[in-house]
Amino acid sequence: MTRVLHILDHSLPAQSGYTFRTRAIMKAQMAMGWDVAGVTGVRHPLDGPDVETYDGLTFYRTKTVVSGRSPLKEWREVGALSAQLERVVAQYQPDILHSHSPVLNALAADRIAKRHGIPLLYEIRAFWEDAAVGNGTGTQDSFKYKVTRMLETRAVRRADAVAVICEG
């Protein structure tokens, strides 16, 4: 049986388009006979147990509290998620790592995928740097935009496969 470990920003029971899409993907994989689980990063918004099952889906939570200013805070988030992934991979023994945007998840997953020889799929749902420009919280000529774009490009190049939700 194929075992897929999803690396997520957040998940159910939080309610968002992101969590509903994740649920649909995981349920479709289960319908194919695959064993699936998820790991959420430190940005998951709800308190709860370290391992939570919701709607038949199991999620491992990264409970580390990360502080500091950008960009050190983001690197600490990647480190915390990598440490949690290391623990979960040892226990769960996945055949595939399926990392979902944002890029911080892909950076953490890449470390573990390379260390353990596990194929990595990176699913890009949006370029978060472009979304920041679109909603007025960032600019295209900013340092943060350029670094995020560089990290996205690196993540795509290092992944074994990439999935996108549109061609636009």
Give residue spans per PLM region:
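Acceptor-binding helix/loop patch of EC 2.4 sugar-transfer enzymes
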Residues: 9, 65-72, 121-153
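An aromatic- and histidine-rich active-site surface loop
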Residues: 97-116, 122-131, 167
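An amphipathic, basic-hydrophobic alpha-helix
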Residues: 67-96, 107, 146, 150, ...
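A short, active-site helix/loop in glycosyltransferases that binds the activated sugar's phosphate group
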Residues: 149, 153-168
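Helix C-cap/helix->beta junction micro-motif
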Residues: 32, 92, 112-116
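N-terminal subdomain of nucleotide-sugar transferases
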Residues: 1-64
